[in-house]
UniProtKB/Swiss-Prot annotation:
Keyword terms of this UniProt record: Cell cycle, Cell division, Periplasm, Signal
Gene: tolB
Name of the molecule in the record: Tol-Pal system protein TolB
Protein family (similarity comment): Belongs to the TolB family.
Keyword match Nucleotide-binding: no
InterPro entries assigned to the protein according to its UniProt record, in alphabetical order: 6-blade_b-propeller_TolB-like (IPR011042), PD40 (IPR011659), Tol-Pal_TolB (IPR014167), TolB_N (IPR007195)
Amino acid sequence: MKFSAYLTTLFIVLFSLFIQTVQAESEVRIVIDEGVDSARPIAIIPFKWNGSDSMPIDVADIISADLRNSGKFNPIAVSKMPQKPTSASEVISDVWSSLGIDAVVVGQVTPNEKGYSIAYQLVDTIGASGNAGEVLSQNQYAVPKNAIRLGAHTISDEVFEKLTAIRGAFRTKIAYVVQKHGGSKPYQVRVADYDGHNQFIVYSSSQPLMSPAWSPDGSKLAYVSFENRKSQLIVHDLQSGARRVIAAFPGHNGAPAFSPDGSKIAFASSKDGVLNIYVMNLGNGTISQLTSGAGNNTEPSWSPDGQSIIFTSDRAGGPQIYQMDVFGNGISLVSAGRGYSGKISADGSILVMIYGDNIVKKDLATGVTEMLSSTFLDESPSISPNGIMIIYSSTQGLGKVLQLVSADGRFKARLPSSDGQIKFPAWSPYLNKN
């Protein structure tokens, strides 16, 4: 198999990026609410362990979970596997194709002094690529001991892209706010892997924190802080821990959103008495006001090309989503009815928003809408960088939890926390070059 030397460097970079953080007390974990029986079946065979003790983490289980979470695949249960090969040469294609499974992933994990060597092969069982039994993709990674999950997510990304022609987003992260039960600093901005693992605290405060937003290179978070008893916008460098106040105007300052090139931040402020959309140039600090007139304007979100901004306004009486260019001109209605918290996917094809109390997807080419959630009081949707998954918060019982739904609505899961309420999720951009 081909050895990817770049990966060891990637693991070091990704972990050093967050070196100044503190490990969180209680991690969130995915709890499946609705499966994907109608999705494409696939087999992720338990990886062979070449060590003397037990394997520290089930790599195949992580890969299965990733592919299942996308809504595109339905991994077969280990108990139903007709064979458990550990290499492509051991895969009996007819056995799998008779079950309707056209792709099988096999692999091995070998411990070494520095960590682990993880190798995998993706096997075509029906000959769609030419011959049954052909290896569609294969690789081998050297990973540090504390990065075995990242190695598994890397395999998931490669398998997903090979089978769908869509870049995988399983090595991305999510930022969110936790309000803990008690303590002197109960409000925390946290970051975790997209699936809730490897959670850590970015910042803790005695006052509320809100609305984290990622910079396009993933190195910074902008968020709202109510320290000093007033709302202010903070840009927080995740590597150095440095915090910069960029807006502390009288009234409310909120809903920060980085431009796609990272040079500007759009935000909402009521500094002149009415909530309006502003854009700040982060290089020189200049501010431009984009909206005006009666009504409140908030929740700015940039289009992928950086040429327009969608936002929520009640100028017509109730909250609706509008779009304007980056100078505040050409304002047009995007959502009919009670819509807010809009986000456009990275490819510009769909708009995800709150419509009524639920998550709704709108195809921007056809105008067709589809309700994706059936949870209660949904808020703050955020789309994965490949447009395949959506994370949001909802009310469950007396608290707030995170919810994950595939963009086709076929897979749904919860990411509850045992130590507080979770709000304001934000999906990171890609954190790796490929």
